[in-house]
């Protein structure tokens, strides 16, 4: 499963949910008629998407098994995933060799070996993508996802090496 977003909570009273997508484009999840909701390391449950729409930087969606606000509220915090076999194939290496969701949770370490935190999300700014890096002190760093800064993405080791100082 590739985690593609997170349920932020209910939206309105008719059972709709608000979704924070982890996809390159806000509407990327709407390409899939079924979503799997659950938690990493836990069980995944298939939900049929009835309707969805972009609402600023989030998605609003109506799911077949979610008839009212109470049902939608019970989904808050769950991850949304798609089986990897249903996703487009990626090149073996390079910037396009992984999905954004593959980067979530990776440790971010600078060239001096200092741990900056873990990837909490990514932002699309138009000029370039930006890593949202959260550290244990609950502070957030925004690190540009550009060649001059991102030295290496090592999915197997679970880390991203960056040319970025602690004081930036």
UniProtKB/Swiss-Prot annotation:
List GO terms (cellular component aspect).
cytoplasm; ribosome
Segments forming domain PRC barrel: 95-168
Which InterPro entries does the record associate with it?
A: PRC_barrel-like_sf, PRC_RimM, RimM, RimM_N, RimM_N_sf, Transl_B-barrel_sf
* Top-rank lineage group of the source organism: Bacteria
Q: Name one GO molecular function term.
A: ribosome binding
Coarsely, its chief localization is cytoplasm
* Subcellular location per the Swiss-Prot or TrEMBL entry: Cytoplasm
- What is recorded about the protein's domains? The PRC barrel domain binds ribosomal protein uS19.
Describe the function of this protein: An accessory protein needed during the final step in the assembly of 30S ribosomal subunit, possibly for assembly of the head region. Essential for efficient processing of 16S rRNA. May be needed both before and after RbfA during the maturation of 16S rRNA. It has affinity for free ribosomal 30S subunits but not for 70S ribosomes.
Q: How does it assemble?
A: Binds ribosomal protein uS19.
Its family remark reads: Belongs to the RimM family.
Task: Provide the protein name.
Answer: Ribosome maturation factor RimM
The lineage, from the top, is: Bacteria, Pseudomonadati, Pseudomonadota, Betaproteobacteria, Nitrosomonadales
